[in-house]
């Protein structure tokens, strides 16, 4: 099966998920070329201001910037892509996202949710959470490396992203499963030396294919 939405490279490389325009700026300056803006707890006006600014930055750096959840604003400001959770799929309009030419990523946590994602045929499928994580309340147990590898094998050539509790130390084992990309949060944003952590993760995962 191939994506119905605009395609992404099979390898998106290092894929940080951050919550501010400041982090988007830092990481683009540091050489990251795939990232996601996940905004929480802001007013509608602040959300739109931040999304518009982040998208403009992404375009300036020719980066793959995904907007989490706010698909209407992503379309309005012409983002590279949108990332939706399973619950977001129920309220979003995937056809509108596809018609606008945006890429779509979808979160999954088990085989049933992978089935749901495949029915939509997004640009990539996120597989998580691999390890315990403190950055987001999760309703399910961690998958672990064996289950991640099984999902990657099932999906074959479909672009995949691993997410959830992936640290610098765990990243090599995650990449050995064959997953196309690794999404990280605290491995960068909570690192004592975020710039050094970013460079080491880029050395492991790369910036992604063109």
UniProtKB/Swiss-Prot annotation:
**Do you know which CDD domains this protein is assigned to?**
TMP_TenI
**UniProt cofactor(s):** Mg(2+)
Q: Which Gene3D superfamilies match?
A: Aldolase class I (3.20.20.70)
Copy the pathway line from the protein's UniProt record.
Cofactor biosynthesis; thiamine diphosphate biosynthesis; thiamine phosphate from 4-amino-2-methyl-5-diphosphomethylpyrimidine and 4-methyl-5-(2-phosphoethyl)-thiazole: step 1/1
Q: Which SUPFAM superfamilies match?
A: Thiamin phosphate synthase
Locate the residues binding 4-amino-2-methyl-5-(diphosphooxymethyl)pyrimidine.
Answer: 36-40, 68, 107, 136
Designated name of the protein: Thiamine-phosphate synthase
List the source organism.
Cronobacter sakazakii (strain ATCC BAA-894)
Q: By which gene is this protein encoded? A: thiE
């Amino acid at each position: 099966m191939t994506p119905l939405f605009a395609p992404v490279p099979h390898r998106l490389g290092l894929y940080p998920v951050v919550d501010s325009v400041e982090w988007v700026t830092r990481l683009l300056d540091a050489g990251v070329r795939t990232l996601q803006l996940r905004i929480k707890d802001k007013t509608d006006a602040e959300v739109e201001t931040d999304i518009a600014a982040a998208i403009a930055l992404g375009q300036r750096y020719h980066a793959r910037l995904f907007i989490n959840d706010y698909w209407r604003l992503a379309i309005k400001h012409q983002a590279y892509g949108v990332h939706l959770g399973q619950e977001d799929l129920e309220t979003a309009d995937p056809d509108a996202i596809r018609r606008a030419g945006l890429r779509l990523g979808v979160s999954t946590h088990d085989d049933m949710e992978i089935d749901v994602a495949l029915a939509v045929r997004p640009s990539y499928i996120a597989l998580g959470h691999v390890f315990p994580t403190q950055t987001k309340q999760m309703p399910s147990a961690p998958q672990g490396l064996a289950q991640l590898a099984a999902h990657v094998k099932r999906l074959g050539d479909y672009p995949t992203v691993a997410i959830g509790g992936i640290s610098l130390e765990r990243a090599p084992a995650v990449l050995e499963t064959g997953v196309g990309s690794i999404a990280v949060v605290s491995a960068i944003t909570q690192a004592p030396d975020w710039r050094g952590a970013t460079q080491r993760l880029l050395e492991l995962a790369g910036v992604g294919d063109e």
